[in-house]
């Protein structure tokens, strides 16, 4: 049985998904989505403890996918952190408006990413207790 927390990494760049997976997988089970539509479906079906969401993705962008996850009864409590190369303040504000709890810009420090994943994945556990 796998007792690891699940983190969904949604990014259209395979190398980013693999990099994040390498960083997180010793402590977390990592699920992958290559576009926003896939991210919404996986979040609904797998109920991850955290979603790391890119903004610029095909099918559904990260904002729209974040909004869809946060406005669905099954997935509304899943914390979402935007993981993106778009670092403008307006993008941060829009991410918060869509329901994201954190904003991580690329390039990122692997230790910082792991720390943020630990912190934000535990948000769901704390609210579920």
Where are these regions (language model features)?
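Receiver (REC) domain active-site loop signature in two-component systems and cognate sites
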Residues: 57
């Amino acid at each position: 049985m796998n007792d690891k927390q699940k983190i969904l990494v949604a990014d259209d760049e395979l190398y980013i998904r693999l990099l994040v997976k390498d960083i997180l997988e010793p402590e977390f089970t990592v699920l992958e989505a290559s576009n926003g539509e896939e991210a919404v479906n996986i979040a609904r079906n797998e109920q991850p403890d955290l979603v790391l969401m890119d903004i610029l993705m095909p099918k559904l962008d990260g904002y729209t996918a974040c909004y869809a996850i946060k406005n669905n009864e099954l997935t509304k409590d899943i914390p979402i952190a935007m993981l993106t190369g778009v670092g403008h303040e307006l993008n941060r504000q829009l991410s918060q408006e869509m329901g994201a709890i954190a904003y991580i810009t690329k390039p990122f420090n692997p230790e910082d990413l792991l720390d943020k994943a630990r912190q934000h994945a535990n948000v769901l556990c704390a609210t579920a207790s």
